[in-house]
UniProtKB/Swiss-Prot annotation:
Molecular function via GO: ATP binding; glutamate-cysteine ligase activity
EC number, as in UniProt: 6.3.2.2
Family named by the database record: Belongs to the glutamate--cysteine ligase type 2 family. YbdK subfamily.
Protein name, as recorded: Glutamate--cysteine ligase
Reaction(s) catalysed by this chain's protein: L-cysteine + L-glutamate + ATP = gamma-L-glutamyl-L-cysteine + ADP + phosphate + H(+)
GO terms classed as biological process: modified amino acid biosynthetic process
HAMAP family: Glu_cys_ligase_2
Gene: gshA
Organism: Haloarcula marismortui (strain ATCC 43049 / DSM 3752 / JCM 8966 / VKM B-1809) (Halobacterium marismortui)
Function: Catalyzes the synthesis of gamma-glutamylcysteine (gamma-GC), the main low-molecular-weight thiol compound instead of glutathione in halophilic archaea.
Pfam families, alphabetized: GCS2 (PF04107)
Length: 359
């Protein structure tokens, strides 16, 4: 990875890219070291060539779709990559599972990757990174101007708590019930340069920040700016990183549809000369906390801060405004966190683990 990107990379509007982090699991559905075998020691299917990588723990693996020029093809690309990963894992004696945190993952019992980048992070960050067994969904949308991308990222912050509430799929961490709907949201926020970013006036301001962080040794590369949304100066995209990982591809595609339509809508508003909203980070953090704690039952602060709105109200507003159906489908289905708790209570931990496996 190049240390920094460039404004010149922002050349395409509306393209898509989907990154997913998964757990490598054994025959019992428990996270296990497997990325060395799957990424380095065996040859993956052609569709995964250059699109497969390991993460901090040897039990976490990441896939990336190719650039998707037509959003209508997102489902085919996503399923093709997922199917190839499952086949590759099974051919080597592993399974693949997805959630924001795996309920059976105990970080002290799991191996960290040996890649120099991760060794540097572990040494620099220490405990918060040592325990970071999280897995998320990252959606990239191409933006054709760097200043526009920064403006869009600023505006997207308001919508992130709704995404997190609908995606909440990590009630368990280190083997116990946290009482949260998305414990991943809190575990990951313990790292530096995470959570809700502040606003940037333009791309120059963002680039200056990125450069200062590198020059001062705060980060080793731009990829270590792990905010919930960021202009990706390498890909020329706006990257949304808020949602928990999901086993069901239909849930993933609902978020992809929503993020894409949001970015396109905001880009048009920028082009129309709309002024951005100066939202206090404290209120954004409050809404994120409510999403972490309550998931789909959350009451989120309204834009004018005069009242709260239920997730159901916000889903109705966003679905009607953007013409997206997937949000309603997400809302009316049992949430990932609710399903995990129900399965553990009714059928036990092995049924819970099995429910997270991709097939």
């Amino acid at each position: 990875m190049d240390a920094t990107g460039s404004a010149e990379h922002f050349t395409r509007m509306g393209t898509l890219g989907i990154e997913e982090e998964f757990y490598v699991v054994d025959e019992f559905g428990r996270p296990t070291s497997g990325t060395d075998e799957l990424v380095y020691e065996t040859e993956p299917p052609a569709v995964l060539d250059g699109r497969l990588d390991h993460e901090l723990f040897k039990c976490v693996i990441e896939t990336q779709t190719p650039r998707i020029d037509d959003p209508a093809n997102a489902g085919d690309h996503l399923r093709s990559v997922r199917d190839a990963l499952v086949d590759h894992a099974e051919a080597n004696g592993f399974g693949i599972a997805a959630a924001g945190l795996h309920p059976l993952a105990k970080w002290r019992e799991l191996e960290h990757a040996e890649k120099p980048r991760y060794k540097s992070q572990l040494d620099r960050i220490q405990y918060p990174q040592h325990r970071n067994t999280t897995a998320g969904l990252h959606v990239h949308v191409g933006v054709d101007d760097a200043d526009k991308a920064v403006w869009v990222a600023n505006e997207l912050r308001w919508h992130l708590p709704l995404m997190l509430a609908l995606s909440a799929n990590s009630p368990y961490w280190n083997g116990f019930d946290t009482g949260l709907q998305s414990a991943r949201g809190k575990i990951f926020e313990a790292l530096p340069n995470t959570g809700m970013p502040t606003t940037f006036d333009d791309y120059d301001a963002f680039e200056t920040y990125e450069q200062r962080m590198l020059e001062t040794g705060s980060i080793d590369d731009r990829g270590e700016l792990w905010f919930d949304v960021r202009p990706h100066s390498g890909h020329g995209t706006v990257e949304v990183r808020a949602p928990d990982g999901q086993a069901d591809p239909d849930r993933v595609l609902a978020f992809v549809e929503y993020v894409h339509e949001l970015v396109v809508d905001l880009a048009e508003r920028y082009e129309d000369g709309e002024s951005g909203r100066r939202l206090r980070r404290e209120f954004l953090d409050e809404n994120k906390w409510r999403a972490i704690r309550h998931g789909q039952s959350a009451e989120l602060l309204s834009r004018d801060l005069s009242t709260t709105r239920s997730v159901e109200e916000l889903v109705e507003i966003e679905s009607d405004r953007l013409g997206v159906d997937g949000l309603w489908e997400l809302y009316h289905r049992e949430s990932g966190a609710e399903r995990q708790r129900r399965l553990r209570s009714e059928e036990g931990v092995m049924a819970l683990a099995d429910s997270l496996r991709l097939s």
